[in-house]
A protein has these predicted regions:
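Short hydrophobic alpha-helices and adjacent helix-cap/hinge residues
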Residues: 2-198
Length: 198
């Protein structure tokens, strides 16, 4: 009978897994991560709208938006939160210790306070790191310019991921007789000026 259809539809909707995807900003590499995640879910039989409901939210670079998005995912009892980039992951971790959180595009998950270790993340959080190996980059740079003596490092000092890479670079430089000249920025409008000063 038609009177039961709404209940059946409601039961079907509530049986779907709810996946919240939070992304700090639109960016080609971050968008690729999101799209790849959704494609892989689909390949594994979890097509959006069938067995799973995917709710993608973009914070547009705003920390307050990040917090609000993650609070919504928690209050609506999502089954898993996918957090793309460190700020998204930190916001999600700050809102729940129960809902599983999977992060991507986080350079230093331990230093960012997301997990206790890479080998055994612990708690409700796991994911992948996109750590850049400063020593490997320097080895390549030295292949191109063998007599390099000074390296410029332009980074955002308030971002733990950036600081981690620069610390690795400084350690490599100290061991290999190189000098690191640092230039820090707080926003993208400062990049050109600080880069010129290096």
């Amino acid at each position: 009978s038609t009177s039961k259809q709404p209940e059946t539809q409601k039961a079907s909707e509530s049986a779907k897994l709810k996946v919240g995807i939070v992304q700090i900003v639109e960016h080609p590499s971050l968008n690729t991560i999101r799209e790849s995640f959704i494609q892989e879910l689909d390949k594994q039989g979890f097509k959006d709208g069938d067995k799973v409901t995917i709710d993608y939210q973009n914070a547009q670079g705003d920390q307050t938006n990040l917090k609000t998005i993650c609070q919504k995912f928690v209050s609506n009892k999502y089954d898993v939160i996918i957090a793309i980039a460190t700020p998204s992951a930190q916001a999600a971790v700050g809102e729940t210790k129960e809902i599983p959180i999977v992060f991507a595009a986080c350079t230093d998950p331990v230093g960012s306070g997301l997990v206790s270790s890479l080998e055994k993340p612990g708690g409700n959080v796991t994911g992948t790191s996109d750590a850049v190996s400063a020593p490997k980059i320097m080895e390549l740079a030295r292949l191109i310019t063998p007599d390099i003596k000074t390296v410029g490092a332009l980074y955002t000092s308030s971002e733990t991921n950036s600081v981690s890479v620069v610390n690795d670079l400084k350690a490599y430089a100290a061991q290999n007789g190189l000098t690191v000249v640092e230039g820090t920025v707080t926003n993208s409008s400062e990049v050109q000026q600080v880069a010129s000063s290096l």
